[in-house]
Amino acid sequence: MASYSWGKRLNRANRYGYDPREDYFRTGVANSESVSLSTGTEKNQTYFSAAAINSNGIVPNNSYDRYNFTFRNTSSFLNDKMRLDVGASYILQEDCNMINQGTYNNPLTGAYLFPRGDDWADIEMYERYDPIDKISKQYWPMGDGSITMQNPYWANYRNLRENRKDRYMLNAALSYDILDWLNVSGRIRIDNSHNTYTEKMYASSNVQLTCLLYTSPSP
């Protein structure tokens, strides 16, 4: 890994003491709440529940949220010969900037390979205004190291990946006892999900990630 090591030789005077655990990572927090309600009579029972999970990851601007809602009702009719069971569930899941595996588009690459002889506080201001183009651009003087490496904070706040998943589940079952030893029944179930994924990369992100790398055709 010598090709990935850069920076001046360290000594007591020029070592800033950068440690990813202390300077980049943060404390992850996960909260979980749930509530349920059930009621009923001899011939009718109803159940409802709701649960939520909200979490913030150990890297900046990383979050995961999930909400679950469940409803179920069972009823009996005609001297308990007919039984109806219906249920419904809804799940909403949202996540922001989940970490990729490997080095590709991964903020941890820059965080781990940052030279210990440089000042981490200097790159915490991850963008600088360019008076020529009149936009703020990524500040990362270390280069990409041939592994699409970027400023970790730029990857966190300017390479945004947001995902939302909605899932609906409905089910119903109806049965009828024709005789003590014979019954007929029918069931139906619907399971539908919809996923929306959005990816935004601001100007000055690595060109290999933004698909702006252009190769001239051969003459």
Predicted ranges, named:
Residues A30, T41-E42, L78-D80, D177-L179:
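Outer-membrane beta-barrel channels and translocator barrels
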Residues W6-S36, T46-N62:
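Short strand-turn segments of transmembrane beta-barrel domains in outer membranes
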